[in-house]
Amino acid sequence: DAVSITSSSDAAELFGDLPLSSDRPDFWNRTFSEASGFIGKSPEEQLPVRKKLISILIGRDGRMEPLAQKYFSLESLIRIQQREIGTGFIGGKAVGMLLARNILSQEDHEFYAKRFVPHDSFYLGADVYYTYIVQNGLWNLRLLQKTKEGYYKYARELHEKILTGRFPHEIREQFRYVLEYFGQSPIIVRSSSL
């Protein structure tokens, strides 16, 4: 008999390691593919690779970088990228959530193991926003709105045009994948950009 899985924690346990399609032969995927070759090597050999991945995925924030270096393994950085829609930084909320989980897991594993279910997150890369703005012909309007004089003057027009834009086909396909992945399970979307 087939059993329907409706619990998000059960779904995370079964499918949490499934990556998004990564058949794009670009700098981003080549970088992470090459980084995969360092899995199993010594921490000293992994260090420059981890630093590079942290700088392009997590960010170069002065306060966050040392914590990321301490608590993100090479494997965990590659797993983040495998579940990222688009490319680029994953954003502060996602970084904070992942960092907090890693700190708890590494500093008090017994506490963590008893109280936390596996997380089952996907991440939206920063390039998705910029691609959306450019593909919908909004770049110049965004630049005008970012000025002191244009902040309020162009805000409504930019807002309305953003609401009527479309994502590129590849991004829409990745969104579909995520929705199909979760099926009927409830999802939470966290973003200050929405």
Language-model features: where?
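N-terminal beta-alpha lobe that positions the nucleotide/phosphoryl donor
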Residues: 1-194
